[in-house]
Every structure is written in C-alpha cells, then in structure tokens.
Amino acid sequence: MAEFKHITVLLNEAVDGLNIKPDGTYVDCTLGGGGHSGLILSKLSENGKLYSFDQDITAINFNKDKFEEENELGKINFIKSNFRNISEELNKRNILGVDGILYDLGVSSPQFDNADRGFSYNYDAPLDMRMDQSQSLTARDVVNDWSYEQLVRIFFRYGEEKFAKSIARRIEKVRQQTPIETTGQLVDLIKEAIPAKARRKGGHPAKKTFQAIRIAVNDELGALEESLEQALDLLNPGGRISVITFQSLEDRLVKVMFKQKTSLPELPPGLPVIPDSQKVEYKLITRKPIVPSEDEITHNNRAHSAKLRIIEKL
C-alpha cells in the first residue's frame, strides 16, 4: 500500500457539521488520505452510503486498501474524477439526491511532500503541479508557453502577487534563452524579480506565484464554483455542505455563494406576501467561519489558515 500520510484538518468540526444520519447518503469530494471519509463511515449504518471523489489515483488506491472491507460491503464507493463532475458521476450511479457533501480544498500533504509532483518551492523537481496526473496541461506549459499578459493576470488574480509584472517579465526574458524546466529554476528567477527588501518578509518569495500557477493548472476556482452549484442542487431537504478552505480566494468564493443562496432577492416594495418562487431555500449554519483551535495549529501548522463554512438546505 503506497503511503499517503495526511493530517486531516478540522476533522470533527467538518463531519459533525454534516449532521450525519446513519442511513443517509454522503459525498466526500476530496478523499485525500481518507480522514474525513473514515469518520463519516464510522457514523453510517449498514444502509448508509458514501461516495468519495479524488482525481489523484494515488489517493484512490491508498484508500481502496485502507477501506477494503467497507468497499466490499458497498458502504464506500470510490470515484476517480474532478469534483466538478459531481452531478454527472452521481447520476451515472442513479444517485439524484444526497444528505451531505464535504470539501477539504487545496493540495494534500502527500502531494506537497512528494518532490516529483512539483507543487512545492522547497524541492527542486520538474514543473508539474497536476492533481490529476492524466491531465495534459502542466506547470511547465504555463510557465513556458503562456503570454506575459496571461502570466500577469494569473499572478495577480490567483496569487494576489504585487510583483506580478516583474516576475512575468523575468520569466519571459529567461525562457527566450532556455526553457524553464524545474521548480528550482522558477524559484531562483522569482527571487531575482522581487526587490531584496520584499524578499525578507511575508514568507517564501515564491509562495504566491506557485499558488497562482497551481490554481491555473488545475482550474481550481472554476472547478469549485461549478461543483458547489451542483452540490447545492443535489442536497435533500435538511442536507448540509461543509467546505474547508485554506486561502482567501477560495474562502471568498464560498462565502459569497453561500450568502447569495441564503439571502432574499431584491423585491419590489409593498409586496404583501413573498412569492414561493422567491423564498430562500438554504440557511447558513456558520455565521462566521469555524477555525482550528490553537492546539490543532500547534500539532499541524498547515491548519493555521483553514476556515470551515456550512450551509443547509431547508
């Protein structure tokens, strides 16, 4: 069994937030190391069902071994797919409604810690960053083939990098001489593009650029938005969605979508009764996001930026 070590963040809070019914049908959109799936399974009866998605075959294979007995009993079903295909994949299995859906977003620890995957600026590795290894677009393609304007846009939008233009300009200059093949090369040229004073504060100088490229390679925000829209429609009455985010762009997207779904639309003044078609179908369970305890952050530093938001279908 291939190792897939990952400390699950906000484990109990996210699963408890789903208000699990023992005979219910649930979806874990981000299987990873199986932490959330395992806790959901422990709360299900023999009639309960869990459908666990991951686009990384390493995670699927690891969990097929880990949950071999539950898999044979049909309690857990593994789906190798991007969670943007949630409706299509569940429809194939004649699942038209579910009681809860969980998302634990971002890159899992094994993906970060496996140097060959090219997610981390701490290792020198081929520029890859694909969550789905069968996908054709890689970080190398983005860095070497995308235009200066495209690079500036993703560095600003997905990395919130204020030195986006100088980094993109440096990339453009270097790649005209020789292809940029590795994370180490990319880190070096990012450092060259950022003023020395700025490099000394605010964490690793390549962090924001690497985040931006990773989001672009995997279309993470597009996939999340599409998936959440479908997930909200899939919920049975009383069903809930728990979403754990790790960076501000994801959290903002979830916050805005949940607010829209739980707010009344603008109506003409003086209407005596709100029409049924205009009534709110969802309610927020978390007015403010749930964040990890100091103790959890002490034991798992990667938890420090996590935020959990929960919504329920009425």
UniProtKB/Swiss-Prot annotation:
Binding site for S-adenosyl-L-methionine: 34-36, 54, 83, 104, 111
GO CC annotations on file: cytoplasm
Protein name in the entry: Ribosomal RNA small subunit methyltransferase H
Catalyses which reaction(s): cytidine(1402) in 16S rRNA + S-adenosyl-L-methionine = N(4)-methylcytidine(1402) in 16S rRNA + S-adenosyl-L-homocysteine + H(+)
Location, primary (coarse class): cytoplasm
EC number of the protein: 2.1.1.199
One Pfam family here: Methyltransf_5
Keywords: Cytoplasm, Methyltransferase, rRNA processing, S-adenosyl-L-methionine, Transferase
GO terms assigned for molecular function: rRNA (cytosine-N4-)-methyltransferase activity
Naturally occurring in which organism (per UniProt): Ligilactobacillus salivarius (strain UCC118)
Subcellular location: Cytoplasm
Family of the protein in this entry: Belongs to the methyltransferase superfamily. RsmH family.
InterPro entries: RsmH (IPR002903), SAM-dep_MeTrfase_MraW_recog (IPR023397), SAM-dependent_MTases_sf (IPR029063)
Function description: Specifically methylates the N4 position of cytidine in position 1402 (C1402) of 16S rRNA.
GO biological process terms, semicolon-separated: rRNA base methylation
PANTHER family, sorted: 12S RRNA N4-METHYLCYTIDINE METHYLTRANSFERASE, S-ADENOSYL-METHYLTRANSFERASE MRAW
